[in-house]
Amino acid sequence: MANAYKSSSEEQQYAENIIFDEIEKVLGITLTKNPKIYLNDKKTHIQPDFYSETNCIVGEIFSHIGNYKVGQSHKIASDILKMLLLDKVKNKKHSKFFAVCSDEEKNKLENSSSWLSESIKQFEIKIIKIDISDDLKEKILSAQNRQKMINN
């Protein structure tokens, strides 16, 4: 049970709620949080962090600060693939957003020489940095350190 607490992502989930609220303010629209969007077969669904069918917007939130592991890169790539699948299945182009909470993450996703960064450019995914409080940053970093201890 102690390990479950150590690997908890409660702080990141809290940060995602705050970031979601800020995204609505930045975009100036009401978004649906974590909707289940069913695909063609009505059995399979995706569940982005935010969505607006009316405004053709879909997005994901990455509440991580600093270097991330390969698994987290795969998570980002998976999130992007889901957004691209939505375009294909719905036969319409959505504005795709990926929200981060640090300049470092924004810069890495937009400007690195990785295939992931190039995919973001080629598929016109907008990386938006949402400012969060220093206190929340510290909570996220503390959680990441705690998770690192249990996951290594």
Say what each PLM segment does:
Residues 43-46, 81:
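Alpha-helical scaffolding within the catalytic cores
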Residues 1-38:
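Acidic-basic catalytic patches of nuclease active cores, encompassing PD-(D/E)XK
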Residues 38-39, 65, 132-136:
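Residue-level detector of flexible, active-site-proximal loop/helix-junction positions
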Residues 48-60:
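Active-site beta-strand-loop-beta-strand hairpin of nuclease catalytic cores
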Residues 62-120:
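Catalytic cores of nucleic-acid endonucleases
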Residues 35-37, 98-104, 130-132:
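Acidic carboxylate-rich catalytic motifs and surrounding loops in phosphoryl-/glycosyl-chemistry enzymes
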Residues 110-152:
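Non-catalytic C-terminal interaction segments of nucleic acid-processing enzymes
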